Amino acid sequence: MEKIKYLKSIQISQRSVLDLKLLAVGAFTPLDRFMGEEDYRNVVESMRLKSGTLFPIPITLPMEKEIAKDLKEGEWIVLRDPKNVPLAIMRVEEVYKWNLEYEAKNVLGTTDPRHPLVAEMHTWGEYYISGELKVIQLPKYYDFPEYRKTPKQVREEIKSLGLDKIVAFQTRNPMHRVHEELTKRAMEKVGGGLLLHPVVGLTKPGDVDVYTRMRIYKVLYEKYYDKKKTILAFLPLAMRMAGPREALWHGIIRRNYGATHFIVGRDHASPGKDSKGKPFYDPYEAQELFKKYEDEIGIKMVPFEELVYVPELDQYVEINEAKKRNLKYINISGTEIRENFLKQGRKLPEWFTRPEVAEILAETYVPKHKQGFCVWLTGLPCAGKSTIAEILATMLQARGRKVTLLDGDVVRTHLSRGLGFSKEDRITNILRVGFVASEIVKHNGVVICALVSPYRSARNQVRNMMEEGKFIEVFVDAPVEVCEERDVKGLYKKAKEGLIKGFTGVDDPYEPPVAPEVRVDTTKLTPEESALKILEFLKKEGFIKD
């Protein structure tokens, strides 16, 4: 520890902290470091390390150009977490450039910024670094430490229970009766035990918070599973939401924890729908890829179709069987749980979830009309964003909501003082405002943000900071000629004369939203009419009571 004071220090992201931890404990075996260039390119293109071993997801350490260019081969550097705690030292062996489109297209199958990882990748540095790692200390956890188990600890627990077959279950959601049924059926199918292995690291933005989920997993394990055959362990994984490739990766990780079988369900590790409303992955694509490679990775797949509840039988059956037998069935989607039950203060039915789970979820959610949300107005300079924002704020306050208004000009004076107008500084400004907005929303406040925010990927990253449905993107649409006519400050004129550089709409592009929640054409609507249109959307979504 004394020597590290004299070494160069680099802060790494929370994603990289989680990757580092799982590298250190052997969860990513055979990997023991962030990937070098040859491994990286092989994995991206063929899902294999340079040794030929199957490994579908690149595990890399991004670095900003300014930092990467000063690194020297062979030097030792300290890797610190976002709070500046030293976690490991790395001997720099490789510094190499990466390409977002190349990686995203091959690994995720898309470059659509609605994919949460694609949006995040736009903020990574231009380089990856790799080298030998020596751990100083691993991140400490003070929540449910008894369930934060390493691969070695889980393998020892499996051995102590005398289980030669064990099926692992991955989830990032609260568990309900259907998941309980699925896992218990899987145990019977393999004739062994169960590893309940929920992810408590980085999941899909907007998922139910980790503390609520951990409480649910704990109570279900303690009250409804046979402890002689079941192990509960929390996995601090940074998910990529990479669908089929991610399913394979999850299987490799569970093999390293001692599992012999792995449950792969419908839409495994899927981030939902793209900008055009189409699913990123086919529902059973992950099962197909896993089946192809299960023998090679050394863990068998236990596939499941969607299970549905049949009232007349008082049991769950696979949906295809229910259809084949003409059975009447019911199920509740995740969206329906949130919108029709939790946010309305309605109790979830007992056929759907255990009463203890229903109680924990009820404590977490407040009625929809009391929940926080963010209205994000984006558009060209002088399109009318600030005026609409002020009118909308007044309308919401008159209806009893407390509103925070984050206007671009005001933010530049306080929150983002010192930032310029380069693309990097503009993205930083957008993400700063987005972070503040997400914290307000998290605590059930209402925030209206009025910023040019010209870059689609940055806006999508802000969207991903919030629970699904709570980021309302409003495209304040007006052609550049109209905006120029409205410009009382003469900024467009100065930009055209070359007196202002990088001005959006003149010499810097504006990327309009692909699928905004609301579009207001300010050449046809007055500011008041535009604000009313947004208000009507908020009423329709249940954020405002009539």
Curated annotation (Swiss-Prot):
Positions of region (Sulfate adenylyltransferase): 1-370
GO molecular function, one term: ATP binding
Pfam families: APS_kinase (PF01583), ATP-sulfurylase (PF01747), PUA_2 (PF14306)
Entry annotated with the keyword Ribosomal protein: no
Reaction(s) catalysed (UniProt annotation): sulfate + ATP + H(+) = adenosine 5'-phosphosulfate + diphosphate; adenosine 5'-phosphosulfate + ATP = 3'-phosphoadenylyl sulfate + ADP + H(+)
Database matches in InterPro entries: APS_kinase, ATP-Sase_PUA-like_dom, P-loop_NTPase, PUA-like_sf, Rossmann-like_a/b/a_fold, SO4_adenylyltransferase_pro, Sulf_AdTrans/APS_kinase, Sulfurylase_cat_dom
Region (Adenylsulfate kinase) residue spans: 371-546
Family: In the N-terminal section; belongs to the sulfate adenylyltransferase family. In the C-terminal section; belongs to the APS kinase family.
Full protein name: Probable bifunctional SAT/APS kinase
Annotated gene: sat/cysC
